[in-house]
């Protein structure tokens, strides 16, 4: 026999249904999954180049390049041996209706969290993090935010809602505590008086990863953490396929070292956003996003014993 029902598929190009070929489960609330992958194909809140709606599909497609590895380096264990993950596909919302997306995503997240699941989400533009934060704050209370980005996304913009204002609204709604939150890789204009600790790109590139991680852990403390990674945190040399690229960013190696070093944080939710494959070269941006998502899952699995 030669279908997925009868054998494992190790091809790098076929059967890219779920992220990393994790099983698809469109009713994940009733499953035995611990972590649920959700795609959010939304880019209506984008200020510059659109195309993030195609991000989840691109990330899933390129993730087949990562699915073959069992005892992944440098973790030296197989993720599947320690944590049960399913991909529930993409959220459904009314085309052209941003409120529908926000409401449906928040309701989906609330139902998953109430069922004892945790979420790794793929955007989509960065606005999608706001309804995710609302759901997670209802379940876990006020959280710390660990935020990788070229932009702080704390701009008021007349109090409008877009992919650059989520972290202006989130503290005002009581979802996150800026004094226990860190923004990493910033290299654009920002308000220095909003309470967040900003580790700008120059610091992150020049200081040791161990030094940075010690500071991050001190700031975050024991609070529940929401981890969000805007792919434009990476330098465009490593992630050209995004809507608002900014030169002078992190290397993929530096980003991986920082993410891998966050094992002691109490991470309760995670996302990777702003992949716009129309501007990508050789799928390197999608591959970076897929790899970061995989490393985030390994970060959780590493806390568990066999």
Curated annotation (Swiss-Prot):
Similarity-based family: Belongs to the arginase family. Agmatinase subfamily.
Cofactor: Mn(2+)
Known catalytic reactions: agmatine + H2O = urea + putrescine
Protein name: Agmatinase
EC number annotated for this UniProt entry: 3.5.3.11
Keywords noted in UniProt: Hydrolase, Manganese, Metal-binding, Polyamine biosynthesis, Putrescine biosynthesis, Spermidine biosynthesis
Pathway: Amine and polyamine biosynthesis; putrescine biosynthesis via agmatine pathway; putrescine from agmatine: step 1/1
Source organism superkingdom: Bacteria
Binding site for Mn(2+): 126, 149, 151, 153, 230, 232
Claim: Metal-binding is one of the keywords in the record: yes
PROSITE patterns named among the record's database cross-references: ARGINASE_1, ARGINASE_2
One BP annotation, GO: putrescine biosynthetic process from arginine, via agmatine
Pfam family, one: Arginase
Source organism of this protein record: Serratia proteamaculans (strain 568)
GO MF annotation: an example: manganese ion binding
Gene field: speB
Task performed by this protein: Catalyzes the formation of putrescine from agmatine.
